């Protein structure tokens, strides 16, 4: 009779430890995929305008006082 509770406890402990096959497959695909595969392209104009905005806005605020 002691085997049944021990079996149930072991079953409960082992089930969360098993990986989700879909999740591991998606993770492995994401690891192998590069930015060019995901159509992620950084636009230089966006980067430059962001840098200029972060520099110019405090400068203009300081000049206005």
Swiss-Prot record:
Location in or out of the cell: Secreted
Keyword Secreted: yes
Distribution of this protein across tissues and organs: Expressed by the venom duct.
Signal peptide span: 1-19
An MF annotation (GO) of this entry: toxin activity
Gene Ontology cellular component annotations, sorted alphabetically: extracellular region
Propeptide residues per the UniProt entry: 20-43
Keyword field: Amidation, Cleavage on pair of basic residues, Neurotoxin, Secreted, Signal, Toxin
Lysine amide modification, residue list: 64
Remarks, miscellaneous: The mature peptide does not contain cysteine residue.
Protein name per Swiss-Prot or TrEMBL: Conotoxin VnMLCL-041
Taxonomic source organism: Conus ventricosus
């Amino acid at each position: 009779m002691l085997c049944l509770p021990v079996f149930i406890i072991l079953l409960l402990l082992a089930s969360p430890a098993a990986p989700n096959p879909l999740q591991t497959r998606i993770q492995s695909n994401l690891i192998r995929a590069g930015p060019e595969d995901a159509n992620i392209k950084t636009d230089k104009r966006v980067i430059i305008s962001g840098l200029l905005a972060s520099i110019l806005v405090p400068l203009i605020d300081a000049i206005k006082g």
